[in-house]
């Protein structure tokens, strides 16, 4: 166990992040981890989850192994750590065996590397198991921990093997799991699946966003209402519009430009360079509105987004909460607007049905994937390959929708994995020593110019580790075609002079087990049925949220995330309508005084307070309680009860 004063984490925060204080709840989480306890941290979107494991990782000896499901998010966090002067490595699909080997070696032998990010399917390969056993691991962090639970909205079977990883580590290594979206059932699942040890803590912050106004606008003309919303937040304010399909994103962005609103589309089908340009222009406020599919937003840090609008409801409230929560992270008032049409509920139900194709379709897609990747029965485990969904479906005459959902089913059963699109530059490492390289150049004059160009443009670091290169830059330097440069690099790779990894732009797919003969694929029919039932429940929750005209929007969301005592927010469309409808509100000062007198005598849960008044006054009582909390006259205790004055959590 490491004895660490509270001052040390704060000093690290100030030194590397430049923040003067922790956000609410962060310090308690860190203290538990630094005391050697397991911890589950449930923080709202934008609540500073990464700091909760990064700071303790620096305060503890050894390296922090971070399990993360998204390549883009992993790479962003590694890049951000390196910018802060902290050393980090990452291992994920699309890297060569040599790159993975080198990254893991660095973590074994370098005491300066503090973070190793790893995608879940890489955790228990023979290579990883052998190397992690030799690492001085000080902390295990599980990002997006809801992926552990089959009841979560993004279940990923490789996460279930994290418990096996824990068995390889000393018992003194604590585990911290973090998520922004977890129902009560998912929380229990996380604790059990990670084998949390006695003394563990669950740290929850309310998912409430007091200054985020949730609204549902029922309309037959979504474009017109969208325009009203975007103009209504004020000139120059930035926003995100979420569309269901790539085509819808492009059409909506084009229409907004016609209406004199600076907008651009963003989706996974665009070339990586274009996606980067659009994202950077939006971050720099050169584009006001970004119209995106759900491929956009994860890991994006733009606190001044004033509005997030959805043209259609997402499939789950978890997804909606995360996407809507990208508005107003600066703590100022912001808006989350869902546009709902007359046929939307029926459309959601149809999509829920389509989301679970029959087993014979799933097997057919599995066989097609084997043909596409030319993978023999018994082979291909964890060998990544470029994957173009459109081309794949067209080649094997599959319906794109069925194919997408069949791949999801195969992922949830633990047979395949498809990553998001990656934009990874070509990489090279010289593996000949300088004397052997010189002799090769003398004997192979036709490759001498390319080798000299590599050394001139990228330096001696090429002998030490993989370095990103540009085939285009080499082409211009040598005045040769890019095709010729790539051909030479491939030859030098095959000749054992260097390791060459070509540029990757497409999503990566891989088999997470040795490939089965499709008819013998051991699909678990019970799990397929359970997944159907879960989707039906999630769809019903979204439909209820959109249809409600009597319950506070934020209260509905918080109840879904196991906050039964949540107060009405006072700023959503439903709460504002209730305020407007009340003709004769009670004397506010007298009501507040009565509540203070009541709670001074006996701390109570909010629902217990509300229950003491007539049902018709419930919204008024909830509003008064919220006001007293905001004024600091009431405070929450650790058990959720309200009492007068400051209370220790």
Where would I find each of the regions flagged by the language model?
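Short, amphipathic C-terminal "tail helix"
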Residues: 630, 645-648
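C-terminal accessory/connector segments of nucleic-acid motor ATPases
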Residues: 357-515, 520-624, 633-636, 643-644
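Residue-level signal for tight coil/turn positions that link beta-strands
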Residues: 61, 209, 504, 638-639
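N-terminal/domain-start segments enriched in small and hydrophobic, helix-friendly residues
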Residues: 137, 142, 147-149, 591-598, ...
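Helicase motor core with emphasis on the C-terminal RecA-like subdomain
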Residues: 2-3, 7-16, 20-24, 28-40, ...
